[in-house]
């Protein structure tokens, strides 16, 4: 264990064995943990599967334990952890709840799919979406009086749209209801973006920017699928040759997802092991698909998805990512590629094109991704959020 690793672990005497075990700390953990322990706010930018969650939750828990001498009231909400999707809330909550429990820190989830948060006996940590947080804040603002930390995960997924503007106001409303708003700490996590300072200042002030680029190598190849993707048989041949049985296929629309799922079932001559995943599919069905993909057996597991699988739901170690069409942005490309080979230092990706023009787009986007060139998307506020938040405030007790 090197000196930096040892020094950081010594600063986390209560939690490092729970959250970080004995493996080497990742770059984002080495950079973030000292900043969070010092009490500073931070925006943490790092690739998928880099250990961002542990980089944030471990020092926060250490501070909670030290501040209350390990005997803090188990019926006070101290940390609200805001996450873009219900599926990711469920995934992170399941991953962390037992670890938090070992530290005598109570936790709960509140979404449209799962709500075990106790209004009269609030747990210490709440994992939720912006919408569910808004509902809770409107009906029970007193819950947030003891709040110490606000965490915003996958912020790039929310920023610069209706939900991001909703979150901006929610953060201010939470602070307004806190007994000690000036002592609140804010932590946001994001994928690579062009102008991190501009994004961060929309949500909180007095922050540090932590950037961990990661060093995963992108192995990329294009596949000509022909008109209407009639040559997808090539995919099957490559999978057999390379002994690939676990892959995620990304599409830009639900319609395309349904089309490709049907074609893959015809090509592989089977229905089992080939799944369709998007937000319109029943939540329980989605969860079962995610569980099946997370299994480590040798059975064929192919999942065709929209952006519903773009952010960090745990679906195990995917051997290859297949892009059925060029993503709309470089950021989206990086997120999708990041879903593959999460336990290694490389990620393998195929870009499937129907027309020669898409092949050129793929080549240019991959070159931009490898060289850190991210598009700058101009921020534009959504005025309709103001109307929604005014209505929400009228219900606030």
Model-derived segments and their meaning:
Residues 78-92, 187-188, 238-266, 276:
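Conserved strand-helix element at the start of the C-terminal RecA-like helicase core
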Residues 53-54, 76-98, 134-135, 191-196, ...:
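Conserved Walker A/P-loop ATP-binding site and its immediately adjacent core
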Residues 126, 130-134, 140-181:
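SF2 helicase catalytic motif II
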Residues 62-92, 177-183:
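Conserved SF1/SF2 helicase motif Ia
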Residues 2-45:
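Conserved pre-motif I regulatory segment
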Residues 297-299, 329-379:
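Conserved segment of the helicase C-terminal RecA-like domain
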Residues 172, 184-257, 355-358, 379-381, ...:
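Conserved interdomain linker/interface between the two RecA-like ATPase lobes of SF2 helicase motors
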Residues 115-118, 275, 279-306:
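Conserved helicase ATPase core of P-loop NTP-dependent helicases/translocases
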């Amino acid at each position: 264990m090197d000196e930096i690793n040892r020094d950081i672990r010594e600063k986390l005497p209560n939690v490092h064995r729970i959250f970080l075990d004995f493996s080497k700390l990742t770059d984002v953990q080495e950079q973030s943990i000292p900043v969070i322990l010092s009490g500073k706010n931070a925006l943490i930018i790092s690739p998928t599967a880099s250990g961002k969650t542990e980089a944030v939750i471990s020092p926060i828990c250490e501070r909670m334990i030290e501040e209350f001498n390990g005997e803090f009231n188990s019926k006070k909400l101290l940390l609200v952890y805001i996450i873009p999707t219900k599926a990711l809330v469920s995934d992170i909550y399941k991953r962390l709840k037992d670890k938090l429990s070992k530290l005598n820190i109570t936790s709960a989830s509140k979404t449209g799919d799962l709500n075990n948060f106790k209004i009269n006996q609030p747990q210490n940590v709440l994992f939720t979406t912006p919408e569910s947080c808004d509902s809770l804040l409107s009906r029970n603002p007193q819950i947030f009086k003891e709040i110490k930390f606000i965490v915003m995960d996958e912020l790039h997924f929310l920023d610069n749209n209706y939900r991001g503007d909703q979150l901006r106001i929610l953060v201010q409303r939470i602070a307004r209801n806190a007994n000690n708003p000036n002592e609140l700490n804010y932590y946001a996590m994001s994928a690579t973006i062009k102008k991190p300072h501009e994004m961060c200042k929309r949500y909180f002030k007095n922050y540090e920017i932590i950037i961990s680029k990661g060093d995963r190598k992108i192995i990329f190849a294009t596949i000509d699928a022909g008109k209407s993707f009639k040559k997808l048989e090539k995919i099957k041949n490559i999978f057999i040759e390379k002994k690939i049985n676990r892959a995620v296929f990304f599409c830009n629309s639900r319609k395309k997802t349904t089309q490709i799922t049907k074609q893959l079932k015809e090509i592989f001559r089977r229905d089992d092991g080939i799944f369709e995943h998007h937000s319109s599919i029943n939540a329980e069905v989605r969860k079962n698909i995610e569980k099946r993909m997370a299994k480590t057996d040798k059975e064929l597991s192919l999942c065709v998805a929209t952006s519903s699988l773009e952010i960090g739901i745990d679906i195990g170690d995917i051997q290859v990512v297949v892009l059925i069409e060029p993503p709309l942005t470089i950021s989206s490309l990086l997120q999708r590629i990041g879903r593959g080979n999460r336990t290694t230092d490389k990620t393998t990706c195929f870009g499937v094109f129907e027309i020669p023009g898409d092949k050129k787009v793929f080549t240019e986007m991959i070159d931009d991704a490898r060289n850190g060139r991210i598009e700058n998307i101009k921020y534009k506020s959504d005025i309709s959020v103001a109307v929604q938040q005014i209505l929400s405030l009228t219900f606030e007790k």
